[in-house]
Amino acid sequence: KTWDLHVKDVFRVPLEENLKMISDTVSYLKSKDKTVFYDAEHFFDGYKSNADYAIKTVFVARDAGADCIIPCDTNGGTITSEFVEIVKEVLAKLDCPVGVHCHNDCDMAVANSVAAVQAGCVQVQGTFNGYGERCGNADLVSVIGNLKLKLGIDCVSGARLKELTETSRFVAEISNVKQRENQPFVGNTAFTHK
């Protein structure tokens, strides 16, 4: 946990013990030759509450050998300008790869994910069609579409880009969730203009 509120009220352990748990867990996984992506759950809420502690948690994970640090906007409530400011501070302080994991409770997940890549993040966690708990996660269809087509960032090959619509529809079908007609990039009404 990266939010001191959760450490105290959910884990019910002292803040230093939580740091030790993070270190021990990452160290154990690295001792087993695992690649470790440390998802810093509730990082943005934690940062807004106690920035020093939230940053300490990711330092501890990095120092224990995490291969990539992933600050998570678990509540999906961080506005893009504030999100980018926090991401830039994390990037300035860490000398390891950084990614992001955004939920979509306030409809900011795609914008925040794209902005994070523009700021220097090297990984985006998301889901096809944005499916996920509550209001969902960053829709990888839109993230990929914007990074590749709007910003020219080579995040997927041209062949993979051509598979977005088919993959999106396949995921909708196996999830038994009707694909939105107006889903950006792949919906039936995308790019239909008068």
What are these regions (language model features)?
Residues 1-2, 118-138:
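Glycine-rich phosphate-binding active-site loops on the catalytic face of alpha/beta enzymes
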Residues 1-98, 113-121:
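Alpha/beta enzyme core
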Residues 71-73, 99-102, 126-129, 157-166, ...:
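Beta-strand segments within the central parallel beta-sheet cores of soluble alpha/beta enzyme folds
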Residues 85, 138, 142, 159-166:
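Generic recognition of stable, solvent-exposed alpha-helical segments in well-folded globular domains
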Residues 105-111:
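Short glycine/serine/threonine-rich phosphate/pyrophosphate-binding segments
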Residues 129-153, 157, 189-194:
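Mobile "lid/hinge" segments at catalytic clefts and subdomain interfaces of large enzymes
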Residues 151-194:
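A mid-to-C-terminal "edge-of-domain" accessory segment
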